Regions:
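Positively charged n-region of N-terminal signal peptides that target proteins for export
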Residues: 1-4
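Edge beta-strand at a domain terminus
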Residues: 98, 103, 125-129, 133-151
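Well-ordered alpha/beta subsegment
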Residues: 108-123, 131-134
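N-terminal signal peptide c-region/cleavage motif recognized by signal peptidases
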Residues: 13-15
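Cleaved targeting-peptide boundary
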Residues: 18-26
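Short hydrophobic/aromatic beta-strand element in the GNAT-like acyltransferase core
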Residues: 44, 118, 144
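Central antiparallel beta-sheet cores of small beta-barrel/beta-sandwich binding domains
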Residues: 30-31, 36-112
Length: 151
């Protein structure tokens, strides 16, 4: 009888646990083209809407009217969970796994990476805020972007 009660309890809890599992579609709020302009240049980031458990993104930094850095990224459903993967020229792809969090925020983490160890996106007053953070030489470091949506 105790075993039956345990099985019933586990079956009843299964939908709740499944509901807590993050999906790429939960990050649809990141979709669109975004920009941050500073005296040093412009950073543009674009995310395609989720399709088949995947999103594709591109970030481009412009200085003096010329692109100086272009980075491609994906967000995909992987066995480890929803994963942000950065593709930088001359480097192997770097995966960051989504940590549990609140709606409107996505914290991707890879503690084995040199820098950054976290890539963070959140909805904010200007539109989309992004941050990379981690440690370099034992010292906490970070960079922030405050993107406004492009028409």
């Amino acid at each position: 009888m105790k075993q039956l009660a345990l099985v019933v309890l586990m079956l009843a809890a299964t939908p709740a646990l499944a509901g807590e599992t993050a999906a790429v579609a939960d990050l649809a709020w990141m979709s669109g083209s975004w920009a941050q302009e500073t005296p040093g240049g412009t950073v543009r980031e674009t995310w395609m809407p989720p399709y088949d458990n995947a999103m594709a993104g591109m970030t481009q930094t412009h200085r003096q009217g010329r692109p100086v850095v272009t980075e491609f990224s994906t967000i995909t459903a992987e066995p480890a969970g929803v994963t942000f993967t950065a593709y930088l020229k001359g480097q192997p792809p770097t995966p960051f796994v989504l940590k549990p969090g609140k709606p409107g925020e996505a914290v991707f983490e890879n503690l084995t990476h040199d820098f950054p160890q976290r890539v963070i996106y959140r909805q904010c007053d200007v539109g989309l805020c992004a941050r990379i953070e981690g440690t370099i030489g034992g010292k906490a470091q970070g960079m922030d972007w405050r993107y406004r949506r492009l028409p």
